[in-house]
């Protein structure tokens, strides 16, 4: 357009020059000054016409731009309606799925994903989101497949992928909008450059045409001033645009931070879910292990019951043997007095048997106690495992509750931040609306001013055209007058010649001629005066035209400035609309995020309810366990030694609970500090908002000052126009006769006015449309306010729920304190029961119990109390083991005594029948001895196998005792226990010693057989002697053999293996009894064997 206008200017300038040349050629002899003035006037008129055409073109461009802006506004409204419809659909579907038990996340969808396939026509970049259908075929994909389930990790990955794709869509849309803005700015800058170039060309032409004029210099100065003002206004607009860009960047950064926080929260939730799954698997494994241990304990209990039943059967057999011996005692007492020595021996044996019976009864009672102890120990271990599991579950639940509280606090903080950002966005939106309203008002004012200026310009153009017509008519008159004057001069010359020729003839007419001549002179003077007045009028008209042209140029410049302002305002309005779109998008995103957070909070509430139900179930199980514990306490008064381990664990749990309480206090302090930080951040944000508001106020004040200046300039121009109008009216009154042509021009201008009126009506319609849009935006803003109020109510309900949770937590703390007091009471009862058990076991050794029990100061020190309880329990275990060893030794002695009694009865019967039969029986006894050897060999093999099993058990016990040794090494007062355990490690060496003893005793048995072979000739020689002496001698031999068998039994590996490993006291008592028995027997070569055995036992003790 600018190039065409410049070409038309050049052509018209040539036409004007040609016209001026023709006119000057036709006039011929005219004055040069008048010709120059007419040429300038013609050029000015041509330039004015060109400027009017250019203004018309500019008005058409403005109309097109307005239509384009209205089309864009309509498209934006349609997009907003589509977005609202899609969001309503998503909400309705989410409500349906939530009613059906499924959760739907709207966060992964955005406005760009809901446009459909129609957007592909205007795409300038490659597609990025998988949710759009960019195909031209219009194939629609399923939009509502973005349901999120927080159970599986795949759904989380899908949600993250969709969220990432929506972010990419937003970034691509931002890039597209940025490119569109850049194109629009480039187009506007290009149009500004073209207008500048056109103005420069016009100024150059005016300078070339009107170099001597001063008005052109003024116009140039004025144009330069207007350009400076335009530059300043552009700089202000650019600064404003930069500020808005910074605000948008800050908002984008805040959104990115929030998205990063949301990603971090999702990662934390995933980690927690994985940890919970691992903990579940660990709990299942522990349950399987506990089941296996329970099955093992039940099998051990069954084996112990079988052993007890076997012991009972053995006791019943022993009682039956004892009764048989009691029946046999009176029969033996009726025998002759020769058997008194034998009766004394029988009494001694009876006393030993009674003693052994009492010891066996004691051992049976101890075994029963041990059985009960083992059963109760297994049950206590089960209870302990259950308590440990429940404590672990409590710890895990407490950790989960703490994590959930932390997550809730973090999410509350995020919600507060989001609310602050929403308030900031609302404030920014309000300020944008206020600015937009101001700009609308400014646009309306500027349009009114433009209309008035166009009206004034048209009026002045009409006046200028009238003045031009008057000037042309005056020129025509002047030319006519010149022609008339020339013709009159010629006539006067002819008349003068005639008069000179006919002076005489026309003397009478001289007076008339003189009078006519005077009249003509007067007329000539009048014509000259008229010419001077016309010239003056022409000069005045030229000045007026110059002033009008300058004013016209100023008006055109002002119109151009106003058009630029309108363009800038429209661009600013477009930017504000984009910002409004962005703010709406951010509001939708924030709404989606709030919905997602509300869903997550609902899920968290469900999890909390589930956890509370689990806690109630645990409480019920704890109450049941308490009842079971009370029942067990009633039944386990004698066997409460193992509860010390429970006390240790309870103390450790108390420490852990104290640490947890400390962590809770630290967390509360951290929460308070974070709340203070949030308060400071809120104050900073408020200060920044106040600063932004101040800046906006400054900008508004600057705009108002610019408006005031503009109005002042307009008022000055109006005054100047009024003055010129008065002058023009005075001039128009003189030229009313030639107003017919002006009427035709007025009709054309009326048509233009009608066009301008139609344009004004269009502008009013646009204003009404914009007002309707503003009303719609206000309604949307009110709806957003209502939603925010609802969200605030929801947040208040959540705060009440958190308060309830804190109250429940305090109640749980009180319950924990009650449990601690109950644990302390239980520990006191356990200590009392341990002391009673120690008193019962320490009847024979009170000094040991005094050493073990220290002062009452230990109740205040839990560690020392635990150490003392452990030592007491270990002492009780040692006492039990000693008693078990005694029972075993007594059993062996009983078996030996039974065998001896049987052999004595057989020998006595054989002596009564016949000595010969006795010799045969001795031979049979030898054969029996050989069989016994074979049996002993078999028994040795069995014992070897038992030794191997015992070695395996010893290895297991060594592994178990290493742990006990590590614990006992921390207690320096109980080092004697370490020595006992070290002796226990030498059990393998004792087994080797028993094997050596067995070899020795086998050699000793061979020597005994040789002695019996030596006794055979003695028996033959004894046949000649008396039967009584033979019977006594045989009885002595039998007694010696029985003593040897008894010593062999004592030296057997079974007896040596039955010696205890952990005790040294019982071994000291057994040799004394053996010595007593050996002293009662006659010394027939058996004393050195007993001495050897005593010597070996002493070595073993050492």
From Swiss-Prot:
Keyword Cytoplasm carried by entry: yes
Residues with Phosphoserine modification: 31, 248, 290
UniProt-listed InterPro entries: CEP128
Compartment list: Cytoplasm, Cytoskeleton, Microtubule organizing center, Centrosome, Centriole; Cytoplasm, Cytoskeleton, Spindle pole
GO biological process, one term: protein localization
Biased composition (Polar residues): 1039-1048, 1076-1089
Entry coiled-coil feature ranges: 215-822, 878-959
Main location: cytoplasm
UniProt name for this protein: Centrosomal protein of 128 kDa
């Amino acid at each position: 357009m600018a190039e065409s206008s410049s070409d038309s200017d050049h052509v018209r300038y040539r036409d004007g020059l040609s016209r001026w040349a023709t006119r000057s050629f036709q006039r011929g002899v005219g004055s040069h000054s008048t010709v120059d003035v007419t040429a300038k006037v013609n050029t000015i008129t041509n330039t004015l016409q060109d400027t009017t055409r250019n203004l018309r073109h500019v008005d058409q461009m403005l109309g097109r731009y307005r239509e384009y802006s209205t089309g864009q506004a309509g498209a934006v409204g349609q997009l907003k309606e589509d977005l609202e419809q899609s969001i309503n659909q998503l909400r309705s579907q989410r409500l349906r799925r939530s009613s059906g038990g499924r959760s739907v996340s709207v966060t992964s969808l955005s406005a760009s994903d809901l446009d459909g396939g129609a957007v592909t026509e205007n795409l300038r970049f490659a597609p990025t989101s998988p949710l759009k259908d960019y195909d031209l075929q219009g194939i629609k994909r399923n939009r509502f497949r973005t349901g999120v389930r927080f159970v599986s990790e795949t759904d989380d990955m899908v949600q993250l992928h969709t969220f990432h794709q929506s972010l990419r869509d937003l970034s691509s849309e931002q890039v597209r909008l940025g490119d569109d803005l850049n194109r629009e700015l480039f187009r506007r800058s290009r149009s500004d450059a073209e207008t500048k170039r056109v103005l420069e060309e016009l100024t150059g032409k005016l300078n070339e045409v009107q170099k001597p004029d001063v008005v052109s210099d003024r116009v140039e100065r004025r144009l330069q001033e207007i350009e400076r003002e335009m530059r300043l206004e552009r700089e202000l607009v650019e600064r404003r645009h930069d500020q808005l860009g910074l605000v948008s960047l800050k908002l984008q950064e805040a959104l990115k931070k929030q998205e990063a926080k949301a990603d971090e929260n999702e990662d934390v939730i995933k980690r927690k879910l994985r940890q919970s799954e691992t903990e579940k698997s660990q709990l299942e494994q522990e349950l399987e292990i506990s089941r296996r241990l329970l099955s093992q304990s039940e099998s051990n209990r069954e084996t112990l019951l079988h052993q007890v039943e076997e012991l009972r059967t053995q006791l019943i057999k022993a009682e039956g043997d004892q009764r048989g011996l009691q029946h046999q005692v009176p029969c033996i007492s009726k025998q002759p007095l020769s058997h008194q020595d034998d009766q004394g021996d029988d009494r001694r044996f009876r006393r030993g048997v009674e003693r052994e019976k009492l010891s066996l009864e004691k051992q049976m009672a101890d075994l029963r106690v041990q059985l009960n102890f083992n059963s109760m120990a297994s049950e206590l271990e089960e209870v302990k495992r259950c308590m440990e599991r429940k404590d672990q579950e409590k710890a895990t639940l407490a950790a989960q509750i703490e994590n959930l509280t932390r997550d809730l606090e973090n999410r509350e903080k995020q919600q507060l931040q989001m609310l602050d950002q929403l308030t900031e966005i609302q404030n920014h939106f309000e300020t944008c609306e206020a600015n937009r309203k101001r700009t609308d008002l400014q646009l309306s004012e500027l349009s009114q001013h433009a209309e008035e200026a166009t009206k004034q310009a048209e009026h002045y153009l009409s006046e200028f055209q009238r003045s031009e017509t008057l000037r042309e008519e005056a020129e025509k008159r002047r030319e006519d007058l010149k022609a008339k004057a020339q013709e009159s001069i010629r006539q006067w010359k002819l008349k003068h010649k005639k008069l000179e020729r006919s002076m005489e003839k026309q003397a009478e007419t001289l007076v008339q001629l003189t009078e006519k001549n005077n009249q003509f002179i007067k007329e000539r003077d009048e014509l000259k005066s008229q010419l001077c007045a016309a010239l003056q009028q022409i000069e005045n008209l030229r000045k007026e035209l110059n002033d009008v042209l300058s004013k016209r140029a100023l008006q055109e410049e002002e119109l151009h400035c106003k058009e630029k302002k309108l363009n800038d305002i429209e661009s600013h309005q477009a930017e504000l609309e984009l910002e409004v779109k962005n703010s709406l998008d951010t509001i939708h995103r924030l709404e989606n995020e709030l919905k997602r957070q509300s869903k997550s909070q609902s899920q968290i509430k469900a999890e909390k309810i589930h956890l509370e139900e689990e806690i109630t179930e645990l409480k019920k199980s704890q109450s049941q366990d308490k009842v079971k514990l009370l029942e067990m306490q009633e039944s386990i008064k004698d066997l409460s030694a193992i509860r010390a381990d429970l006390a240790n664990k309870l103390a450790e749990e108390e420490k852990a609970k104290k640490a947890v309480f400390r962590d809770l206090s630290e967390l509360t302090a951290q929460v308070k500090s974070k709340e203070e930080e949030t308060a400071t951040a809120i104050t900073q944000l408020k200060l920044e908002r106040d600063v932004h508001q101040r800046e906006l106020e400054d900008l508004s004040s600057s705009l108002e000052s610019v408006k005031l200046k503009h109005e002042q300039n307009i008022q000055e121009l109006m005054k100047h126009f009024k003055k010129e109008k008065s002058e023009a009216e005075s001039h128009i009154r003189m030229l009313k006769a030639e107003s017919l042509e002006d009427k035709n021009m007025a009709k054309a201008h009326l048509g233009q006015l009608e066009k301008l009126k139609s344009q004004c009506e269009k502008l009013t319609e646009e204003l009404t449309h914009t007002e309707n849009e503003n009303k719609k935006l206000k309604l949307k803003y009110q709806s957003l306010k209502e939603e925010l109020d609802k969200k605030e109510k929801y947040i208040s309900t959540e705060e009440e729920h958190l308060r309830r949770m804190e109250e429940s937590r305090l109640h749980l703390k009180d319950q924990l304190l009650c449990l601690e007091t109950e644990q302390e009471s239980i520990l006191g009862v356990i200590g009392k029961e341990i002391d009673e058990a120690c008193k019962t076991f320490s009847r024979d050794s009170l000094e040991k119990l005094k050493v073990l029990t220290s002062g009452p100061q230990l109740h205040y020190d839990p560690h020392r109390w635990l150490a003392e309880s452990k030592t007491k329990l270990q002492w009780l275990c040692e006492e039990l083991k000693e008693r078990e060893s005694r029972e075993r030794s007594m059993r062996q002695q009983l078996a030996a005594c039974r065998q001896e009694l049987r052999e004595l009865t057989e020998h006595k019967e054989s002596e009564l029948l016949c000595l010969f039969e006795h010799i045969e029986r001795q031979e049979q006894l030898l054969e029996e001895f050989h069989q016994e050897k074979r049996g002993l060999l078999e028994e040795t093999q069995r014992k070897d196998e038992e030794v191997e099993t015992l070695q395996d058990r010893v290895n297991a016990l060594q592994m178990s005792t290493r742990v006990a040794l590590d614990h006992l090494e921390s207690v320096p007062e109980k080092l004697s226990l370490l020595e006992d355990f070290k002796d226990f490690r030498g059990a393998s060496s004792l087994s080797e010693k028993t094997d050596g003893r067995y070899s020795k005793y086998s050699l000793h048995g061979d020597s005994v057989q040789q002695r019996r072979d030596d006794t055979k000739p003695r028996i033959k020689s004894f046949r000649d002697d008396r039967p009584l002496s033979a019977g006594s001698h045989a009885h002595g031999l039998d007694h010696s053999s029985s003593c040897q068998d008894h010593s062999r039994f004592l030296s057997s590996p079974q007896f040596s293996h039955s010696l205890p490993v952990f005790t040294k006291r019982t071994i000291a008592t057994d040799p004394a009894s053996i010595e007593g028995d050996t002293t009662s027997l006659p010394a027939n070569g058996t004393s050195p064997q007993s001495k050897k055995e005593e010597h070996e036992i002493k070595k073993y003790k050492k």
